[in-house]
Structure formats: C-alpha cells, structure tokens
C-alpha cells in the first residue's frame, strides 16, 4: 500500500504541474481569429475539411440523438460557414456555393423534415423554415457576387432567386395574417430567436434585388418586437406565449442568434441590444471571459434542452457563439480572449489537413466553433464598437494565472512531499 501511495504522489505532481503549465502557456499562442474581415481564419480550411468528413459519416444522426435539432444544425451551420468564408475571400465563392447547396439539400430532405411538425406555418414551423430560407439567401447572394463561376447556368440563378422570393413571400404573408412577430417552431413552443433568420433572409433578398419589397414588413416587425422586450433586461425574450405576450427573460443562447443577425437588419437597435446584453451577461470563469445563461447569473444553474449543461450558471454553447458575435460588434478583445482560451481548453489537433477539438467527440461543437470563428456581416455597415472596452477582457490571462496558482502550489507541495517524506 505504501508503495502504491508513493507511486501516486510521485506521478500526481508531475501530471498536475504539466497540465497547469501547459494550459497557462497555451494562453499566449496567437488568436485563431483573422484580424481582417477580408481574410479567413488561418485554420478554417482544416476545420471545414474535418466537418465535411463527419457530415458524411453519420455525425448528424448521432447529434440528433443528443440535441433536438442536431441533424439540422450540423448541416445549416456548416453551409453558413462556407457562405461567410466566401464573403471574406471571394476566391472560395464557387466552392462555397457547392457546399452550401449540399447543406440546403440535406435540410430539404424528408428525413430532416420529419423532425418538425408538418402542419405549422409557413413550412414545418418557424425554426425549420427560417434557417432554411436564411441559408438559401446566402447561396443566392454568393451566386451574384464577384468570384462566382460564370459557368453557373443563368437558369440555376433564376431558379434559386425565384425560390428565395417564394419563401420570403410565404413569411411576409404570415406576418400580415398573424398579429404576432413570433411563431411556433413546435406545437405550443415559440422562441423569438427562431424568427430572426427569416427576417435576415428578407432583408438580404431586398439587397440582392435592389428592391424594398419586404422593408415594410421588416419595419413593422421591428416595431412589434420592441413592444415585447423583457422589462427586466430590455432584451428580446427567450420564450413567448402563443398570444405573443412575453414570458421569461432574455437568455444568452437565444441572444447569440438574435445579435448575430440583427446588425444586418437594424444597426442602431443591434448596437443598443448588444450593449444591454454585454452589461448583464458577460462574466468570467476562472478568469476566462464567458457568458451567463441568465442575466447576472440569476437563474437556473442546471440548464435545459435549449442551453445544454450549465457550469455555475455559465453557458459554454453561448460562449462559443460569442466569438462570432464579438467580432460583428467590433468587440475584438472579448472575441479573441474566448477564442484563445478555447484553443487551450479544446485541445485542438490537426492531422491530415483536418482540425478537430477534443478529439472530435462532439462534431456539432466543432461545427459551431468554425461558424463562430468565421463570423462576417452580410452587408456593409458602420461597425458597432462598444462605447467602453470590457474590463473583463483586460488582463484576463493574469487572472487565469491567479486562479490556477493554487493548483500550481498543490503540485509543488506534492513534489516536496515525494522528496522529503516518502
């Protein structure tokens, strides 16, 4: 027994010291984010390669067993990542269109449709329909931009544009017929963030066609949304009742989708919402910037089907999305801090021109990281530089060193114990 104890002590301090030193040193590696919106992140190609491979090896089906929209999100986020990559680097346009159309085909499959209620308008409910038209809007946008192959048949462009307009028309009629800015994704379930991709698609369609066909609907939607804001946080709420009345405060998981889309819809409102959100939700964990799921951490610390597991009230899925949102609002220090820390915690591994995190055990997580690191606005704008830089992102590495110092001292203590007493 004594020999076993000696073995444990002698190797425990080595392992603990190695982990602490590796993690703290890893924080000084360069940020994986591109510092220029005309460049893609350095490892994006390797991430896309890895994600494409798992998408064809059953990962979406496995993720569907874990998350309610696992199959759907795997494909749609991968397609959107390609779209925004081509916006950063137009030389990727042709390849991006091909991959985004493949993602769209998977969303349009019967297997994917069967996950959602077929009787909910406008097409299998708000979630399914909104993200689908959002992806199609991105495809059509790329078909029209410089860098698109001239070999793309004119009929293909016309067909895709006509389909985009048809889907946007369906949404416009729904907004006109129903006295609510939000609609059911599932029977009895309304999540306001599920509508944002459709509004974003309508705005994109207007820009593509140089028309304002949907602007009146968008303006009325914004007016109605501002009447439903959560009185506690001033944000768009997480859940709404079927009659359109707000229930529940704004939450980080839904705010990440809302804030990701809003700059292309209404810059001023987006800026206001981001400032409110950052003030109440941005926090730290062990010194690393991250997000509370509930404002000021005053809510459930367990999590639910929307958030996944929470750690002391922190949402790691929302924190990953914050990498992209921070870039869109010119909050680069926060985005960089989360991204750099994620490279340390996620233990990325690049092999055979493929990059995966934590050995690729959670493919949807890898897809979310690529989507977030590659975030790009779909329209030109004035930027959203926060009025004040976040103090949380200032000197955050030193805070991590401070919080991890007890583990370092424990390793030293075990080392001393192994030398002196055994």
Listing of model-derived features with the role each one plays in the protein:
Residues 18-84, 98-112, 155, 159-172, ...:
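Low-complexity, Ser/Thr/Pro/Gly-enriched N-terminal "stalk/linker" regions
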Residues 23, 70-86, 124-141, 190-206, ...:
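Well-ordered alpha-helical segments within folded domains of soluble proteins
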Residues 67-70, 74-76, 80-196, 374:
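Extended ligand-binding groove/face enriched in aromatic
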Residues 420-422:
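Conserved small/polar residues in nucleotide/adenosyl-binding loops
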């Amino acid at each position: 027994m004594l020999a076993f104890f000696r073995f444990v002590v002698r190797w425990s301090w080595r392992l603990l010291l190695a982990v602490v030193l590796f993690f703290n040193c890893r924080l000084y590696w360069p940020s994986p984010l591109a510092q220029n919106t005309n460049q893609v992140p350095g490892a994006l190609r390797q991430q896309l390669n890895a994600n494409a491979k798992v998408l064809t090896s059953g990962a979406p089906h496995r993720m569907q067993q874990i998350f309610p929209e696992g199959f759907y999100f795997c494909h749609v986020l991968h397609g959107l990542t390609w779209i925004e990559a081509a916006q950063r680097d137009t030389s990727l346009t042709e390849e991006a269109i091909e991959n985004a159309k493949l993602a769209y085909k998977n969303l349009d499959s019967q297997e994917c449709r069967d996950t959602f209620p077929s009787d909910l308008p406008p097409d299998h409910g708000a979630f399914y329909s909104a993200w689908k038209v959002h992806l199609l809007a991105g495809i059509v946008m790329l078909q029209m931009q410089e860098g698109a192959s001239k070999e793309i048949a004119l009929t293909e462009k016309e067909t895709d544009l006509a389909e985009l307009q048809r889907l946007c028309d369906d949404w416009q009629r729904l907004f006109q017929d129903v006295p609510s800015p939000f609609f059911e994704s599932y029977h009895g379930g309304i999540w306001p963030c599920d509508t944002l991709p459709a509004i974003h698609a309508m705005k994109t369609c207007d820009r593509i066609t140089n028309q304002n066909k949907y602007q009146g609907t968008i303006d009325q939607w914004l007016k109605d949304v501002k009447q439903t804001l959560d009185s506690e946080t001033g944000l768009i709420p997480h859940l709404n009742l079927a009659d359109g009345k707000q229930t529940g405060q704004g939450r980080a998981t839904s705010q990440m989708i809302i804030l990701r889309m809003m700059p292309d819809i209404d810059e001023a409102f987006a800026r206001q919402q981001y400032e409110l959100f950052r003030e109440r939700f941005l926090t730290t964990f062990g010194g690393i910037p991250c997000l509370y799921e509930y404002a000021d951490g005053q809510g459930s610390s367990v999590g639910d089907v929307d958030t996944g597991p929470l750690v002391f009230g922190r949402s790691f899925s929302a924190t990953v999305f914050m990498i992209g949102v921070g870039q869109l609002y010119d909050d680069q220090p926060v985005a960089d801090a989360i991204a750099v820390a994620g490279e340390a915690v996620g233990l990325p591994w690049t092999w055979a021109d493929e990059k995966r995190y934590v050995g690729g055990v959670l493919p949807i997580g890898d897809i979310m990281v690529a989507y977030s690191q590659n975030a790009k606005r779909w329209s030109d704008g004035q930027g959203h530089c926060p009025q004040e830089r976040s103090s949380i992102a200032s000197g955050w590495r030193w805070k991590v060193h401070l919080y991890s110092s007890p583990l370092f001292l424990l390793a030293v203590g075990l080392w001393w114990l192994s030398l002196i007493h055994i």
